[in-house]
Amino acid sequence: MKKISNQINNERLWERHESLANFGLCEDGGVNRQALSIDDLNARKQIVKWLEKTNIKVFTDDISNIFFRLEGIDKKSPPVLIGSHLDSQPSGGKYDGVFGVLAGIEIIQTLSEKKIIPE
């Protein structure tokens, strides 16, 4: 098994953190991106836009949850799930919730780019 932690694109990960922090940005540097607000929905659209530029399957459900999938070798094996939330508390920190989402995206995108196919 290849080690991918050293292959993560740290610059892309940081730029995406900064980009998402602009959705609902407050004067104090925090965010107010409450669930299903315009800022939350726009952040979700940005996530989908990033993923549509890859070979990763992207889909949403009826309540705007975003799912992305990189097919593995064995289609019967259970998936690995990584996630978090894009919305924030009314006075959340700049990165409230987004790290888990962005970490999952960066991992799956790195696997895809490096042509590492999970079992």
Name each region found by the language model.
Residues V31, G92-K94:
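Short acidic, glycine/proline-rich loop/turn micro-motifs
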Residues M1-G29, E71:
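N-terminal hydrophobic or amphipathic helices/low-complexity stretches enriched
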Residues I82, K94-E119:
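Alpha-helical metal-binding/catalytic segments enriched in His/Glu/Asp
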Residues N9-R16, D39, A43-I47, P78, ...:
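General structural feature for long, well-ordered alpha-helical segments within catalytic domains
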Residues L25-E71:
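A non-catalytic alpha/beta surface segment that caps or lines the substrate-entry region
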Residues H17, A21-G24, T54-N55, I108-K115:
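Structural signal for hydrophobic packing residues in well-ordered secondary-structure cores
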Residues T54, K75-V80, I117-E119:
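Short coil/turn connectors at secondary-structure junctions
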Residues P78-S91:
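Glycine/charged-rich beta-loop-alpha catalytic/anionic-binding loops adjacent to active sites
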